[in-house]
Amino acid sequence: MKDKLTDALYGLGWSTVKKLPEPVAVRLGQRIADETWKRRGKGVLRLEANLARVVPDAPPSRLAELSRAGMRSYLRYWMESFRLPAWSPRRIQDGFDVKDLHYLVDGLAEGRGVVLALPHMGNYDLAGAWVTTHLGVPFTTVAERLKPESLYDRFVAYREGLGMEVLPHQGGSAFGTLARRLRSGGLVCLVADRDLSASGVEVSFFGERAKMPAGPAALALQTGAPLLPVTLWYDESPVMRGRVHPPVEVPADGNRAERIAVMAQETADAFAAGIAEHPEDWHMLQRLWLADLDGGPGASGKPGDSPDPGGPGNSGGPGDPGSPGSPGRPGMEKP
């Protein structure tokens, strides 16, 4: 029954929100965000705890402001995502402005493919639709299997409708397909700021230990494709902003695992730089730092705030390429 209700809620969002006038949808998203923030549920409290790592000197009043803005940013993502299938190509092109795009254009021109790695910032579905529409470049991503199957099918159909090739997340088999796409000069996009599986790579993130997927670095190392971190954010305009960061350097020395670790750390550093500039647009409503997971300093110990095995990038397996994650509970996780 719960699975059917979840599926129905997402279906309702896609079928009704896109029919609303845009100003109405914007106000609706802000109202839902403000009401959710006022309830001070687990997701909001976890968001504030995570933001406290990003802005460690912020007083409680500042953290409250950031978390409220964060929930508004998060609901803007959902309102946009429900409306994206109805947007015209012109609306998509006008809806995103990106800095340093030349890193992506130059990388594709080299013919080796490109790996884009993103944190849970802004609206990566809009960014993806912009790439396929403005640049005319299709790309490949992965999605975890969801329950019920009809919900998984909804998200696959949604992203395929935006011009993406969506692979089921099946560890090594997905990795092999992604590598083939890169060798043929294709583009691969992966959300890569959280991986609690055994294959996750430990990094320093805002001064504390966290784990992130090995996949983006492993794909770049194996295929020779450049790895480009990308960060996204909103401002007061209807246009989402973004930045393509410089290519992650491939270490000349070390074994495969050591080189992947260095590249994962450089990717994490790029994510941290973007998040520090726009903390309210980082939609991390789950535990991330290892101290929060193993009872170390900073652990909240709140019931029900345990890591979600179906959450972003949690699937393990050798060569795990990372994952856009799963929708999880409505209003709690980005897909």
Predicted regions and their residues:
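Membrane-anchoring hydrophobic helices of lipid-metabolizing enzymes
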Residues: 1-118, 135, 154, 161-163
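Non-catalytic C-terminal accessory region of glycerolipid acyltransferases
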Residues: 2-5, 30, 36, 68, ...
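Residue-level detector of family-conserved "landmark" positions at structurally sensitive sites
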Residues: 61-62, 142, 169, 230, ...
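Catalytic core of membrane glycerolipid acyltransferases/transacylases, capturing the structured
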Residues: 110-171, 184, 198-201, 205
